[in-house]
Amino acid sequence: MDPNCSCATDGSCSCSGSCKCKECKCTTCKKSCCSCCPVGCAKCSQGCVCKEASEKCSCCA
C-alpha cells in the first residue's frame, strides 16, 4: 500500500484507517483517510490537504 496514500482531486477516499496520507484532496471521504481529517468532517468535500506538521487539515481546522 502506498504510504502517502495520495488521492486524486475529485476522487474518493478509500484508504485504510491506519493510512497516513500527506496529500488528500478527495471530494468524498469514505473513511478517515487522513489522520487530520475525521470521517465526520463536513467540509471534506471542499478538498482537504493534510499537512504533516499539523493534526488537523485545512478544511477541518
UniProtKB/Swiss-Prot annotation:
Positions of a divalent metal cation 3 binding: 15, 19, 24, 29
Gene Ontology annotations for the cellular component aspect, listed alphabetically: cytoplasm; nucleus
Record bears the keyword NAD: no
Modified residues (N-acetylmethionine): 1
Binding site for a divalent metal cation 6: 37, 41, 44, 60
Any one GO molecular function term: zinc ion binding
Signal peptide residues on this chain, from the entry's feature table: none
Binding of a divalent metal cation 4, residues: 33-34, 44, 48
SUPFAM superfamilies: Metallothionein
Protein's UniProt keywords contain Oxidoreductase: no
Beta: annotated segments: 1-29
Residue sites binding a divalent metal cation 7 per the record: 50, 57, 59-60
Pfam family, one: Metallothio
Coiled coil: none
Residue ranges, annotated region (Alpha): 30-61
GO biological process entries: cellular response to cadmium ion; cellular response to copper ion; cellular response to zinc ion; detoxification of copper ion; intracellular zinc ion homeostasis; negative regulation of growth
Residues that hold a divalent metal cation 5 according to the record: 34, 36-37, 50
Alphabetically ordered keywords of this record: Acetylation, Metal-binding, Metal-thiolate cluster, Phosphoprotein
Amino-acid positions noted as binding a divalent metal cation 2 in the UniProt annotation, renumbered to this chain: 7, 13, 15, 26
Function: Metallothioneins have a high content of cysteine residues that bind various heavy metals; these proteins are transcriptionally regulated by both heavy metals and glucocorticoids.
PANTHER family per UniProt: METALLOTHIONEIN, METALLOTHIONEIN-1G
Entry similarity comment: Belongs to the metallothionein superfamily. Type 1 family.
Protein name as catalogued: Metallothionein-2
Lineage: Eukaryota, Metazoa, Chordata, Craniata, Vertebrata
Name of encoding gene: MT2
